[in-house]
């Protein structure tokens, strides 16, 4: 079943604030094997001009993908998540994510395309801090593979 094209441009309500913790940043940096001291040492981050430790660039995927759940679970969209694979991910930063940030994400369906029987869904996640300042935009591309013929 094709995805509902009429939903292109639909935005979903902002998520509840997610508080970025130093420990979460450290765990993520270790998990991805990034030893940049700005991710684990507040003094190293301050020496680079940051008020506290900063997160690796892909850290926000964990909150933007969770926010994309509003899109994925929208029954009007018609997405069969059992057929979905992650196709692509991009980020555009206004500033680094920092420990202590309280971030919200607003997800928008940016595009729906069909190609070779597969549906391609592009979701844009706008991330803002509690002051309403833009921090990062994340684009997630999901591919709903065509159903296999019996």
Curated annotation (Swiss-Prot):
Q: Name one GO molecular function term.
A: (3R)-hydroxyacyl-[acyl-carrier-protein] dehydratase activity
A Gene Ontology biological process noted in the UniProt record is: fatty acid biosynthetic process
Could you tell me the superkingdom of the organism this chain comes from? Bacteria
Give residue ranges for domain MaoC-like: 8-116
Recorded hits in PANTHER family, A to Z, give:
HYDROXYACYL-THIOESTER DEHYDRATASE TYPE 2, MITOCHONDRIAL, HYDROXYACYL-THIOESTER DEHYDRATASE TYPE 2, MITOCHONDRIAL-RELATED
Give the family from UniProt. Answer: Belongs to the UPF0336 family.
Descriptive protein name: UPF0336 protein SCO4636
Native organism is Streptomyces coelicolor (strain ATCC BAA-471 / A3(2) / M145)
